[in-house]
């Protein structure tokens, strides 16, 4: 099919972080991408304020170093949940370095991150951002998806004579939020878990030093459940739960905001109130994430309460999971059927974080004092029985898809350590590279694989190296890879571009079998050696 038949390879509806990151990742691979944003200007208020170690690793794809970035910071306190008396009910580990090579938790100012994503996109010859373009129709044929749109700066009041325009793409991605036009057009239903709580969100810029207690914590006081967390460098976020019968419009007023902050010694003389808005926390997810040549991502596919700090993270995981699949398909290396595995994998993974977020929400969203007292007694006993060990949130697993179910660690998040490669000592991603990787413990996989396996690996641009002691191409400086593979009883490991484990293998024969299976799962075309 001639590329001249298309206006773009991928049309992304929605210019938030999920859509823009996807555009940048595809643009880096030379694919033509058009972002459609219905508003004439971008939203300049934060929604998310935090991301985890996995997202820090993903941001490395676009050159953002979360450890050394003036727009990102981190804190050393655990994420504590306390009752009205100040007793600890729950500790979540937000303090340590992880096996991803990054800290458990980072804090940022979302408008700044989004601007940097857009600025990067605008430097790319293959990425176009269209503001003031409202999608009003979506149609598909065998080879394309077409967005029917209206060019207007007033999407809520479209003029009768507004210019109409169609954009024909090979694929359409709906990254257009909770009220997704793309999802609704495709008839993809959302499963609603019946979780609804209204909270007042306050974003502040302190002008004086203020004592917050610990850096990030939850006050589980039935009289007013409250969240106190960073909002990125130089900013703070406060969240107050709306009580039963409370007028939400009045709650969101500036006067109400300062009244709620006053007991915390936060006053207009000590901080600038940048935003006051009531949000309804919900838990919903789409059962199907694809219909023909259209797919959904981010809030269009899933919503969760913010208590685990994973909402935006889930959307950025979607971006990378889609990007490497679309790259293989658009490059002609893989059949279109590969895209079916995207939703299958991501749906189960995001379920974990939705459930975990709801569990945390069920701890704090209690306004009945008797119920709160019973909760306190139970959770204090549970914490004492655990000797105060913080809750580990990093156990989510991919759903069925592109990973070997018979391998130890298949479908799990891969580890990353400090290595030395060709004279450079750094994290593996920065020293060796990102993408598919086949690593052998003190063994060069290229020396033991047959020609068909090597052709398939070369087709997907895989890194193929030995890792381990000084005899290996990649020196395992910290010993992480050596310990990891020995613990798995493996000599080889295959990892994916989104940093998940495809498989582990004990010997060359098993590795070759796994690579053949990988070729089949990726639907690699015969011209690339599958």
Swiss-Prot record:
EC number(s) stated in the UniProt entry for this protein: 1.14.13.219
GO MF terms listed in the record are:
3-(3-hydroxyphenyl)propionate hydroxylase activity; FAD binding; pentachlorophenol monooxygenase activity
Copy the pathway line from the protein's UniProt record.
Aromatic compound metabolism
Q: Which UniProt keywords apply?
A: NADP, Oxidoreductase
Which InterPro entries does its entry note? FAD-bd, FAD/NAD-bd_sf, PheA/TfdB_FAD_monoxygenase
Q: Please cite one Gene Ontology biological process associated with this protein.
A: 3-(3-hydroxy)phenylpropionate catabolic process
Superkingdom assignment: Bacteria
A family per Pfam: FAD_binding_3
Reactions this protein catalyses: resorcinol + NADPH + O2 + H(+) = benzene-1,2,4-triol + NADP(+) + H2O
Q: What happens when the gene is disrupted?
A: Mutant loses the ability to grow on resorcinol, but its ability to grow on hydroxyquinol is the same as that of the wild-type strain.
Q: What does this protein do?
A: Involved in resorcinol degradation. Catalyzes the NADPH-dependent conversion of resorcinol into hydroxyquinol through hydroxylation.
Q: Which NCBIfam families match?
A: PRK06183.1-3
Name of the protein? NADPH-dependent resorcinol 4-hydroxylase
Q: What is the lineage of its organism?
A: Bacteria, Bacillati, Actinomycetota, Actinomycetes, Mycobacteriales
